[in-house]
Amino acid sequence: MTRDGVKPYEFRAIAHQEISKYPSVDMQQVRVTSIRHADASFEITTEQGDLFSAKTVLLATGLKEILPPIEGLHDYYGKSVFCCPYCDGWELRDRPLVVISEGPQTFHLVKVVWNWSHDLLVCTNGHQVLTEEQRETLRKKGIEVVEDRLTALVGKQGQLERMVFATQEERARRGGFVAPQLLQASPFGEELGCEMNAMGGIVTDSFGRTTVPGVYAAGDASLVVPAQLIIAAAEGSRAAAGVNTDLTERAFL
């Protein structure tokens, strides 16, 4: 809310500016290489070799997206090809779109994208992921499914124009959605011994507590899906309350 259309780097700059006003906050623009238990605390080591000690650790490192290895896809990702219909579907409404998906989520993703465009082409990039019943449902909606392998996405200045298949066939498209593989952006949750859920997220309670005392997780690292900024921010707020509550209880012992 209040930040519709803002670029991620602009949002990040605003957040840093607001946080910097608090004297108790020290922001370090460094990469952490390891986190380990040290008696009743944790030792955090950075890429530069600096060592920090902390009573608690909040993992909010998010996810990394692994895109299908299709030539040109990275050139259009985040510009005219996106992963989240709820984030960018409105901006692509009524255009001829492609849905690139190689897994069991394909049918669901197509149904969601249908809310914004009825001119859809489904590309499974050489994978057979749809049942006959699902194919028939899509056919009745006028949605074509192409299982041939994609070799390239072509366009100009980030705007997708056409798809190229291994058969040399081409299809015109003006945008679309892709289902990337989502992985933890950092290994710290697993390295610290946190329980992971079936989606690869860190298991937490309602206040961000993991199964390891003193370790908390928030945002996409614990939720995995839906991966949205406003949800991640809310999870961060709840985890912060959990950290504060537990530190307060310890201080009164």
Predicted regions and their residues:
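Glycine-rich active-site loop/strand segments that organize a redox cofactor
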Residues: 1-12
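A Rossmann-like FAD-binding core segment of flavoenzymes
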Residues: 13-39, 43-46, 52, 115-201, ...
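FAD-binding core/adjacent interface of flavoenzyme oxidoreductases
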Residues: 26-95, 202-206, 210
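FAD-site-proximal beta/loop scaffold in flavoenzymes
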Residues: 64, 75-91, 180-226, 232, ...
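Cofactor-binding loop segments of dinucleotide-utilizing enzymes, especially the Rossmann-like FAD-
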Residues: 86, 102, 125-127, 220
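Rossmann-like NAD(P)H-binding beta-loop-alpha module
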Residues: 95-116
